[in-house]
Amino acid sequence: MRVLGFMTGTSLDAVDMAVLETDGEGISAFGPAGERKLTDATREILLEATEAALKWERGEPEPQIFAKAAVTVAEEHFAAAEAFLAEHGLVWSEFDLLGMHGQTVLHERPQDGVPGRTVQLGDAGLLASLTGRPVAHDFRSADVAAGGEGAPLAPIYHLARARASGLEPPLAVLNVGGVANVTFWSGPGDFAAFDTGPGNGMIDLLVQARKAGRYDAGGRYASVGRVDEAVVRALLAHPYFEAPAPKSLDRYDFSLEPLEPLQLEDACATLVAFTAEAVGRGFELMGEVPREVVVTGGGRHNPEIMKALAARLPAPVKTAEDHGWRGDSIEAEAFAYLAARCARGQPISFPKTTGVARPMTGGRIVQPE
């Protein structure tokens, strides 16, 4: 199948797109990949939807902004893809399927017998109508309904990508996005995954709150700051770090309040140290040392995060590009791959990745009208 995958992360930065040819097991070809920055208007609507989601009590009606935001996400995806296809000389009829993750505005893990909640906004029916192609979407809700965490979902793709590169276990793939998650590939058919803690999401929120930009570009603030070890310890006291794996996070699960007394540079340096220590503790939780750690996601562009990871982790730290991977496109590739698995009825979540009782299929496919 030729599939176009889409991903929009919690950083609200861009629509990522990638083309794969896959049967949901192996990858026969990697097509073009790219991104289109979200418009300011779309970002504002999605921020409003996220704020509404954070206030949304269980049992209450869905916030009205969700429907408007879902249409906006679909329209933004279509506009991004139209430009992407034109750039690469492609047409919609070349694709068997589209895979749209949607925009996460809420993710609550199951706790103390209370089931989780997860919301990804995106009007898949509208996208199918605009493109004339079937769209796989809603990848997480079946896992959550079955008692799973609903995240992370990329691990099965991490294995396929590693095999396509000739990599062998034991291997770790670390995605440093808004939240950081790791996939441990121990051996044939043996893999586990979970969210280690915040990635660069808290740094983004901090920089935005201080009116200092959208993110710490190139680690320029963290590079001249000093780590406040007491604040790192306070952040690490969060009960999440005592919970057994598999487990998942939302980027808003941690408060910036402990960082308020710190100067911007010191706060950024402290969050870098916190992210690296949280990842390190995640590796200790697994109790095994991989041959190497392959880092994907936007966090790998921050030299301070990469230096902190190299100092903290027990194995060599490499970037996705060191193995010829497209590090900014891994998530979009993953949802192209998961869309193919959805179409073929193959599982996308597993007991050791989301805590679900058995391997679960996921996603729904909507046909164009």
Curated annotation (Swiss-Prot):
| Catalyzed reactions per annotation | 1,6-anhydro-N-acetyl-beta-muramate + ATP + H2O = N-acetyl-D-muramate 6-phosphate + ADP + H(+)
InterPro entries the record matches = Anhydro_N_Ac-Mur_kinase (IPR005338), ATPase_NBD (IPR043129)
**EC numbers for this chain:** 2.7.1.170
Pathway assigned in UniProt: Amino-sugar metabolism; 1,6-anhydro-N-acetylmuramate degradation; Cell wall biogenesis; peptidoglycan recycling
What is its EC class? transferase
Query: Which GO molecular function terms does the record list?
Result: ATP binding; kinase activity; phosphotransferase activity, alcohol group as acceptor
Where along this sequence does the record place binding of ATP?
A: 9-16
* Keywords noted in UniProt: ATP-binding, Carbohydrate metabolism, Kinase, Nucleotide-binding, Transferase
Task: State the Gene Ontology BP annotations.
Answer: 1,6-anhydro-N-acetyl-beta-muramic acid catabolic process; amino sugar metabolic process; peptidoglycan turnover
Instruction: Say which family it is in.
Output: Belongs to the anhydro-N-acetylmuramic acid kinase family.
Q: According to its UniProt entry, what is the function of this protein?
A: Catalyzes the specific phosphorylation of 1,6-anhydro-N-acetylmuramic acid (anhMurNAc) with the simultaneous cleavage of the 1,6-anhydro ring, generating MurNAc-6-P. Is required for the utilization of anhMurNAc either imported from the medium or derived from its own cell wall murein, and thus plays a role in cell wall recycling.
Protein name per Swiss-Prot or TrEMBL: Anhydro-N-acetylmuramic acid kinase
Q: Gene encoding it? A: anmK
